[in-house]
Regions:
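N- or domain-start disorder-to-order transition segments that initiate the globular core
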Residues: 1-41
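Active-site-facing alpha/beta catalytic cores
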Residues: 7, 66, 79-244, 265-281, ...
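Glycine-rich phosphate/diphosphate-binding loops that line cofactor/substrate pockets in enzymes
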Residues: 37-45, 251-256
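Conserved phosphate/anionic-ligand binding catalytic regions in large, soluble enzymes, centered on
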Residues: 48-61, 323
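Conserved, mostly hydrophobic/aromatic
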Residues: 52, 261, 327
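Redox- and metal-dependent alpha/beta enzyme cores, enriched for Fe-S-associated oxidoreductases
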Residues: 245-250
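Internal helix-turn-beta structural module
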Residues: 304-342
Length: 343
C-alpha cells in the first residue's frame, strides 16, 4: 500500500474545544447566516459579493483585507452584502504546487496538516472577531468542513469536485448555502444534477458513521466558464448563458433558483483585470430581464490588497501567491460602481 499513516489528527470537536467560539460570536454568525440565506431565497434583494483572494496565504494580510471590506460594507450596505472569500485550501489542476494554508501554514515550509487545521480555524475566527464577517470557504475536502462549521456562512464546491458523490452528499447535510460550480467541461447538466443531489436527503457513510442528511434547499449554481478540448477558455456569464440557465431552472423542481457569477477563472480567460467589466455586464443583464435579475444573487470576485500575483516564495505582503487578483483600489472602485448600478 503506497500510503503512510503519519499521525492521527484531532477530531473537529477537539479542535473546536481548543479554540471555542464565544456566545457573542455565535450570535453574530447566526445573523450573518440569516442575511446570506435571505439573499439566496430572494427575501433580501441586495447583491451578494463573495470577494477575496484566490487563496488566503497569510493571516495578517487577510485580516487587513477583511477590515477594509468591513469599512466598505458600511458604505454600500443598502444594496450590497459582502461575504469575504477566505479560501484555506487550493485545488490544483495537476496536483502540484501550493495547496493552501491547510496544507502549508507557512507557504515556504513543509506540509503540516495539524498546524494547518489550527491556523485556518484561528484565521477564520479572527476575521469574525475583528470584523463581524463569517466567511466563505471552499469545500475541497468534505471531512474538513466540520473543523470550521461553526464559523463559516457559505461553502463552495469547485469545478473539479462538483461531480463527486461525497461532496454532493455532504452538501446535502449543511445548513448554510452551498454554491455548485459548473465543471470545467461546461456541462450545465452536471451542475444541475449536483444541486438536485444536494437539495435531497440521503443516507450515507461518513467518518465511520452511517449518517442521514435532510437536504439543503440553499444549494445553488455558480457559473465559472469552461475549457474546451483545445484548452481554450469559454465564458458563460453572457446574457444568453444566463437565459439558458434560467430555462434549466424553470424545467426543474429545484428550490430557490439562484446563481452566483464567478468573474475570474474561465469567465475571464484568467485575465484578472477583466473582472470589473464582467461584473458590470452581468448587472446590466439583470436590469434588462426580470427573470435573470431574480435568479442572479451575486458575484464571486478574486481580489486582494495588491494587483496581480507572485510566486509562493515572493514575500510581497498582500499579493496573491496563486491566481492573480485585482488590488484594493480597483476593488473599492468596483464595489462602489456595483452599488450604484444596483441602486
Amino acid at each position: 500500500m503506497n500510503l503512510e499513516f503519519k499521525r492521527k489528527l484531532p477530531t473537529p470537536q477537539t479542535v473546536k474545544d481548543m479554540y471555542p467560539v464565544t456566545e457573542e460570536l455565535a450570535r453574530q454568525k447566526l445573523e450573518n447566516d440569516r442575511q446570506i440565506k435571505a439573499v439566496i431565497t430572494g427575501e433580501d434583494q441586495r447583491l451578494m459579493l463573495l470577494i477575496g483572494p484566490c487563496s488566503a496565504d497569510r493571516e495578517d494580510a487577510v485580516l487587513e483585507y477583511a477590515a477594509r471590506l468591513r469599512t466598505l460594507q458600511e458604505r454600500v450596505k443598502d444594496t450590497i452584502l459582502i461575504v469575504p472569500r477566505i479560501y484555506s485550501n487550493k485545488p490544483r489542476t495537476t496536483g502540484d504546487g501550493y495547496k493552501g494554508m491547510l496544507h502549508q501554514p507557512d507557504p515556504n515550509g513543509q506540509p503540516d496538516m495539524l498546524k494547518g487545521l489550527i491556523a485556518i480555524r484561528k484565521m477564520h475566527m479572527k476575521v469574525l472577531e475583528q470584523t463581524g464577517f463569517s466567511s466563505a470557504d471552499e469545500l475541497l475536502y468534505p471531512e474538513n468542513y466540520y473543523y470550521l462549521s461553526d464559523i463559516l456562512s457559505y461553502a463552495a464546491i469547485g469545478a473539479r469536485s462538483v461531480e463527486d458523490q461525497q461532496h454532493r452528499l455532504i452538501a446535502s447535510g449543511l445548513d448554510v448555502p452551498v454554491g455548485m460550480k459548473n465543471p470545467t467541461s461546461g456541462d450545465l447538466s452536471v451542475m444541475m444534477n449536483s444541486i438536485l443531489a444536494a437539495q435531497h436527503p440521503h443516507t450515507f457513510l461518513f467518518s465511520q458513521w452511517e449518517v442521514h442528511s435532510k437536504g439543503n434547499p440553499l444549494a445553488h449554481a455558480i457559473l465559472r466558464g469552461s475549457v474546451n478540448k483545445y484548452g481554450r477558455s469559454l465564458p458563460n456569464y453572457h446574457y444568453e448563458d444566463l437565459s439558458q440557465l434560467y430555462e434549466l431552472y424553470a424545467k426543474s423542481a429545484l428550490a430557490n433558483p439562484a446563481v452566483i457569477i464567478d468573474t475570474n477563472h474561465s469567465n475571464s480567460g484568467k485575465r484578472w483585470e477583466q473582472q470589473a467589466r464582467i461584473a458590470k455586464e452581468v448587472l446590466h443583464s439583470t436590469r434588462h430581464n426580470g427573470d435573470i435579475g431574480r435568479m442572479v444573487k451575486g458575484l464571486m470576485i478574486e481580489s486582494y490588497l495588491l494587483d496581480g500575483c507572485q510566486k509562493p516564495d515572493g514575500g510581497v505582503y498582500g499579493l496573491s501567491i496563486t491566481d492573480p487578483c485585482i488590488g484594493w483600489e480597483k476593488t473599492e472602485q468596483l464595489v462602489l460602481e456595483l452599488a450604484e448600478l444596483r441602486g
